[in-house]
A protein has these predicted regions:
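Short functional micro-motifs and their immediate structural scaffolds
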Residues: 14, 18, 28, 40, ...
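Short, intrinsically disordered linker segments that flank or connect zinc-binding domains
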Residues: 21-25
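A detector of tandem-repeat and repeat-rich interaction/domain scaffolds
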Residues: 4-5, 10
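Short, low-complexity disordered segments enriched in Ser/Pro/Gly and basic
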Residues: 1-2, 28
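Hydrophobic alpha-helical segments at protein termini of multi-pass membrane proteins
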Residues: 8, 26, 34, 38, ...
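The −1 position to Zn-ligating cysteines in a subset of zinc-ribbon hairpins
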Residues: 5, 19, 31, 45
Length: 381
């Protein structure tokens, strides 16, 4: 156990002490209990000796392995709880309006004014409530009154509700506020459609895509993730303002949300025609419930990975061949493949477990994105 000196009385105390036993002064600074080096308080492992500063959890294990893949030294800027702590707090209409006013030269803050500790989201929940309120009368109109005019609206609202909600979450945590909302909508609509078409072209090749087999399910995962990653990369190369990890998360999420929404709308209609209204409603519920861990999350990871390997360089084709980018994308491919595999487990345990794993990766990249804000400030000084 390392010893440090109290800043008030100079008495030697343990580096893990919270108060000086001699004078009672609070030890506000953080030190490694193993080697005594001064810390910022956000580190997971000591940067000097590698001593673990947090308890071993599934999250920490995933973080450590991601650090090995990326070569980064991640820090805990925010936790999952921090990101959602303002969800149920009261906000004014002006607060709501301000969230969507960004992306122009006059509404994009300077990097030095961006506080990485303030990453949180709350508008996403309001958007979800709007979808639910709109969905209920369309369902009543079609199911209770048999009016077919309500069917298209019910399908679209049921398919779009959760993907769009998650997309708004990523829009909110893009603290750089350098991507206007109309571009997010563009990436959502065009990205979703283009990635679906690209996937269909791959599916037309003579390869096994039968998800009743393990190899076929894995091939489906590879095809769809390559299609989404290609479109995400295309948008990132075309965008002049998207230079950061949080931007990659957002644009990736937009493409993934579009893919998920359009695909789900098709499944709802197809299964409904084949199995009736009960099957249609069940499809809406199940795909909505599982949507947070699917296409939106996987594509967001791919976008974040590309912007991470780019760093502060100009995005180049060489970054697409970066081993770190390919390995991170492989996570999405494998997750997608396992998701589609014919694995029997009760209560959707497989997709729920994969959702948790995907979001641990997302939180990892959110923290890297917040750390990048501090790094960008240092470059400007």
């Amino acid at each position: 156990m390392a010893l440090i000196k109290c800043s008030e009385c100079g008495n030697e105390i343990s580096s893990s002490a919270k108060f000086c036993p001699q004078c009672g002064a609070s030890v506000e600074q953080h030190f490694c209990p193993e080697c005594g080096v001064k810390l910022k308080g956000t580190e997971i492992n000591c940067p000097e000796c590698g001593f673990p500063l947090t308890k071993k959890t599934a999250s920490n294990i995933i973080t450590e392995n991601l650090d090995k893949i990326t070569g980064a030294k991640s820090e805990n800027y925010v936790t999952f709880k921090d990101l959602f702590k303002y969800t149920f707090k009261k906000h004014s209409e002006e607060d709501l309006d301000n969230v969507f006013v960004c992306g122009s030269s006059s509404t994009t803050p300077d990097v030095k004014d961006v506080n990485p500790k303030k990453a949180s989201a709350w508008v996403y929940f309001k958007i979800f409530i709007f979808f639910i309120i709109a969905y209920i009368p369309t369902r009543i109109g079609y199911i209770n009154y048999g009016n077919l005019n309500f069917l298209p609206a019910m399908i679209m609202l049921g398919a779009f509700a959760v993907p769009v909600t998650i997309l708004i979450f990523f829009y909110e945590i893009n603290l750089f506020r350098n991507i206007p909302f109309y571009k997010v909508i563009k990436y959502f609509i065009l990205g979703g459609a283009l990635s679906l078409i690209l996937a269909i072209l791959f599916f037309s090749l003579d390869i096994n895509t039968d998800i009743s087999t393990y190899s076929g399910a894995l091939m489906v995962g590879l095809i769809e993730e390559v299609a989404k990653a290609a479109i995400v990369a295309f948008f990132l190369f075309k965008s002049k303002n998207s230079n950061y990890i949080l931007n990659g998360l957002l644009i990736g999420a937009a493409v993934g949300a579009g893919f998920a929404a359009f695909e789900t709308a098709g499944y709802i209609l197809r299964y409904g025609l084949a199995g009736g209204d009960a099957v249609m409603l069940q499809t809406i519920k199940i795909r909505g419930f599982l949507a947070p861990g699917g296409h939106v999350a996987w594509a967001a990871i791919e976008g974040a990975a590309l912007m991470y390997v780019k760093g502060f360089e100009k995005l180049d084709k060489k970054h697409l061949n970066d081993k770190r980018f390919l390995l991170i994308c492989l996570i999405s491919v494998v997750e997608h493949g396992i998701w589609d595999m014919p694995i029997e487990a009760p209560y959707y345990l497989v997709p729920i477990g994969l959702t948790v794993a995907a979001w641990l990766v997302i939180i990892y990249f959110i923290n890297l994105g917040l750390k990048q804000i501090d790094d960008a400030k240092k470059l400007k000084n």
